[in-house]
Design a protein with these regions (language model features):
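Catalytic cores of eukaryotic secretory-pathway lumenal/extracellular enzymes that build
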Residues: 92, 107-108, 115, 147-150, ...
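Alpha-helical scaffolding within the catalytic cores
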Residues: 7-11, 55-57, 264-268
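Helical hinge/lid and interdomain linker segments adjacent to catalytic or ligand-binding clefts
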Residues: 24, 28-139, 145
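Flexible, charged surface loops at secondary-structure boundaries
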Residues: 17-19, 60-65, 249-252, 273-274
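Short, flexible, glycine/charge-rich loop motifs used to bind or transfer phosphoryl groups or to couple energy/partner
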Residues: 13-14, 57-59, 115, 245-248, ...
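Hydrophobic targeting/anchoring helices
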Residues: 1-36, 45, 283-284
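Catalytic beta-strand/loop cores that center a nucleophilic Ser/Cys/Thr
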Residues: 36, 43, 140, 159-160, ...
Length: 291
């Protein structure tokens, strides 16, 4: 009886897993096996999954899956903002050509237009009951694409014409799923999409001081956040990515914050609901490699 009372007071609960989730990973066709930590993890533990990319998404094939994973994808049409450092590298040029070919094949004059169409399908997928888990640049760039759909944030090296210098005045945050009131960093030579990200601040903290705390939730009241924060430790070692985390002031109040760096406004883990579905954002690239 004492154990039963404690069980109730602590807020524990039992959740039945009624079916095996069918998983899709959004990944470009030229991605190497070691480029995506998620694929490595799924392969290692032998969890089956399918790969999908833009064509499959626009064909409506996401409805066949329960769980969609996005990793370090750029949905703004700026190819990861790698131009300054890698603009002449063969892998960058191949990535650019692959995306341009797909845009042309599917009837879009710009890659940014293709990616916006894909993001709308991702939003529809969640709204219809799917679960989407995103990491790294896959966290913020969908909302940046949605907010900037009525202007042009891509400079000439990305789509052949200049960006709108007043793009930040034309952002529509009502289109966004997670973020609001952010500003886009339009300099194509700066490896950063917007002021949402915390990477520059985090670098000043240093690897050995970077820990974030997973929040506690009652499994009886909040079963999904409770499942998402199950871990052997409440203090998790931080790590970087193109998008390492999110400044709290830019997160919509309807979101559930799952983890933060103590004493800061650095949010590392977010969960939200949309329609019949849910989505989760986790900052950083590879937990086993700080930088």
């Amino acid at each position: 009886e004492i154990i039963e009372i404690d069980f109730i007071l602590i807020g524990m609960d039992v959740v039945s897993l009624e079916k095996v989730a069918k998983i899709a990973v959004y990944v470009p066709p030229n991605t190497l096996p070691w480029d995506d930590a998620v694929q490595l993890a799924l392969d290692y533990v032998e969890i089956p999954y399918d790969k999908v990319w833009d064509e499959e998404v626009l064909q409506g094939k996401l409805k066949d899956y329960d769980w969609l994973h996005l990793h370090h994808e750029d949905f703004t049409g700026q190819y990861g903002k790698f131009f300054a450092a890698y603009g002449s590298s063969p892998w960058y040029l191949m990535q650019k050509q692959t995306n341009e070919n797909m845009a042309s094949k599917l009837g879009y004059s710009k890659v940014s237009q293709l990616k916006l169409a894909v993001v709308r399908k991702l939003r529809d997928y969640v709204n219809g009951g799917g679960f989407m888990f995103t990491m790294c640049s896959g966290t913020t760039t969908p909302d940046i694409a949605l907010a900037s759909q009525y202007t042009d944030i891509c400079d000439v090296m990305y789509d052949g014409d200049p960006a709108d210098p007043n793009a930040n005045d034309k952002l529509d945050y009502s289109e966004c799923m997670v973020f609001q009131n952010f500003k886009i960093l339009q300099n194509p030579y700066v490896y950063e999409y917007s002021d949402i990200d915390i990477t520059d601040q985090e670098l000043m903290t240093g690897q050995y001081n970077d820990y974030f705390t997973l929040f506690d939730f009652s499994a009886k009241i909040d079963p999904v956040p409770s499942m998402l924060t199950q871990c052997h430790t409440a203090a998790v070692k931080g790590y970087l990515g193109q998008e390492s985390g999110f400044r709290e002031e830019f997160i919509k109040p309807s979101m559930t914050i799952l983890a933060k760096n103590n004493g800061t406004d650095w949010v590392r883990y977010i969960h939200g609901n949309l329609g019949r579905g849910t989505f989760t954002l986790y900052g950083g690239y590879d937990p086993e490699d700080y930088q």
